[in-house]
């Protein structure tokens, strides 16, 4: 079975060392309770119709969640993610073409004071 697209995006990020130092999770964020932990959560976010033998566009949301009091590090990683994808949009045959859409949104804070960016990506893939 082919992994779902959000899992393939997670693998692409890991191969590019973009998840280093972060706990990666799929679908939902499960906080460990340790305020020094950082997270990346990969989840599907819609897309175009998926048909056999035709390409489709998949949307994936990536939540980048920082450690409490370490806003600069999470902001720097978000910039690194965007730069890596801009420079390597077709580097993984399991993805096809990936691009950021929506830019970098304003971050929000969790109740605990963690900075959260919600990045969106469009992946154009067909076999």
Predicted features along the sequence, with ranges:
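Charged, amphipathic alpha-helical segments and their flanking helix caps
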Residues: 1-23, 41-127
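N-terminal, polar/charged subdomain of small-to-medium soluble alpha/beta proteins
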Residues: 37-39
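Short acidic low-complexity segments
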Residues: 25-34
């Amino acid at each position: 079975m082919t992994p779902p697209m959000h899992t393939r995006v997670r693998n692409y990020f890991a191969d590019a060392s973009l998840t280093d130092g972060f706990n990666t999770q799929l679908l939902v964020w499960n906080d460990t309770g340790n305020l020094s932990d950082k997270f990346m959560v990969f989840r599907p976010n819609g897309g175009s119709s998926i048909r056999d033998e035709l390409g489709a566009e998949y949307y994936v949301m990536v939540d980048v969640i920082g450690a409490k009091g370490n806003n600069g590090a999470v902001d720097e990683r978000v910039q690194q993610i965007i730069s890596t994808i801009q420079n390597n949009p077709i580097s993984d045959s399991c993805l096809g073409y990936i691009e950021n859409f929506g830019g970098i949104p304003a971050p929000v804070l969790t109740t605990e004071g963690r900075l959260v960016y919600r990045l969106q990506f469009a992946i154009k893939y067909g076999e």
